[in-house]
């Protein structure tokens, strides 16, 4: 009986259409693409996973696209290929250059409709592009809707498209791409005014990583009349994971309007949390140095590359 079962299983494995593998097969292994921000890489267990779908969602203007751009920048730094599917027609080469993205080497598509968007993504996956960003699900318009009059508005047209098309797209992740989909949060109609995402529930069902982004406070500089908002604290929460990471935990990183995420301050905050930098009131101690105020600590590391590299090594080893 055992021999019969063994023979039957062996025969099944010869049928390539069944796509059978043992659980420890290399087919199921995947690498990660880091954000390059210590607290975020810790939260996500090393970054965005390849061969998986990551959904980044939140209100408008909280840094969702910026986070995706940092993944692209890190892929390009290691010689990989990246693509941006721009359904919102918002691609700005100057802004992405400021985000350290190698713009001339980035594939940018602005499809005419939702079907064309998904077909482009499928072909890019099959071509082995390392990371593909869809910005955004909210901008997907099916061809049947796009070709009609503006008054044509069938019920749940966007959700129906995403629910039926996303499962067809995901098998192509086997070619090795990291697929990042960005979506907006909108207030639903009704007395409860709950936040929801356009595109239906399939996106959250099939996502391997679900990152929620929101603004948790402003960063001000100056005093009195000269005080102005220069950025905000970006809170990133891992709402769901099928691939490790600190599920349901969140991190807060400083985002400056002119320069994106403040990497130096991000390292400092992580070091304070891990007690590598000791804070006593307004004073901060690191090794033999003692300075006053967070800006003082930042200045210390900005003026001393060797000291900053020492801090980075402590946080990454």
Residue ranges with predicted function:
Residues 1-27, 218-317:
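C-terminal regions of RecA-like/P-loop NTPase motor modules
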Residues 2-106, 122-123:
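The Walker A/P-loop phosphate-binding site
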Residues 16, 60, 75, 79, ...:
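Conserved NTP-handling cores and scaffolds of large molecular machines
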Residues 40, 55, 96, 135, ...:
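Residue-level signature of catalytic and energy-coupling elements of molecular machines
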Residues 54, 130-134, 177-179:
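Generic beta-sheet signal
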Residues 54, 77, 176, 294-302:
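Catalytic phosphate/metal-binding cores of nucleic-acid and nucleotide-processing enzymes, i.e., regions
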Residues 59, 70-71, 75-168:
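Conserved inter-motif catalytic segment of the P-loop NTP-binding fold
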Residues 155-274:
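Phosphate-binding/switch region of NTP-binding enzymes
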């Amino acid at each position: 009986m055992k021999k019969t079962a063994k023979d039957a299983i062996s025969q099944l494995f010869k049928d390539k259409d069944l796509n059978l593998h043992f659980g420890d097969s290399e087919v199921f292994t995947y690498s990660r693409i880091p954000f390059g921000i210590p607290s975020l890489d810790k939260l996500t267990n090393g970054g965005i996973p390849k061969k998986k779908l990551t959904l980044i969602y939140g209100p408008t203007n909280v840094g969702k696209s910026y986070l995706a751009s940092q993944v692209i920048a890190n892929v390009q730094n290691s010689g990989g290929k990246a693509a941006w599917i721009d359904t919102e027609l918002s691609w700005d080469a100057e802004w992405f250059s400021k985000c350290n993205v190698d713009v001339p080497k980035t594939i940018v598509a602005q499809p005419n409709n939702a079907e064309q968007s998904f077909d482009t993504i499928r072909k890019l996956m099959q071509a082995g592009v390392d990371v593909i960003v869809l910005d955004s699900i909210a901008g997907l318009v099916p061809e049947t809707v796009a070709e009609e009059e503006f008054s044509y508005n069938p019920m749940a047209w966007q959700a129906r498209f995403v629910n039926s098309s996303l499962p067809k797209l995901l098998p192509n992740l086997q070619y090795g791409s990291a697929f990042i989909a960005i979506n907006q949060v909108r207030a639903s109609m009704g007395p409860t005014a709950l936040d929801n995402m356009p595109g239906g529930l399939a996106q959250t069902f099939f996502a391997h990583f679900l990152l929620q982004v929101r603004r948790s406070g402003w960063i001000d500089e100056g005093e009195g009349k000269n005080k102005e908002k220069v950025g905000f604290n970006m809170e990133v929460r891992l709402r769901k994971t099928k691939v490790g990471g600190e599920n349901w935990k969140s991190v807060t990183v400083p985002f400056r309007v002119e320069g994106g995420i403040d990497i130096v301050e991000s390292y400092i905050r992580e070091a304070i949390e891990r007690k590598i930098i000791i804070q006593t009131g307004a004073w901060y101690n690191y090794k033999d140095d003692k300075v006053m105020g967070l800006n003082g600590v930042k200045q210390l590391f900005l003026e001393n590359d060797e000291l900053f590299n020492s801090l980075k090594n402590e946080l990454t080893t």
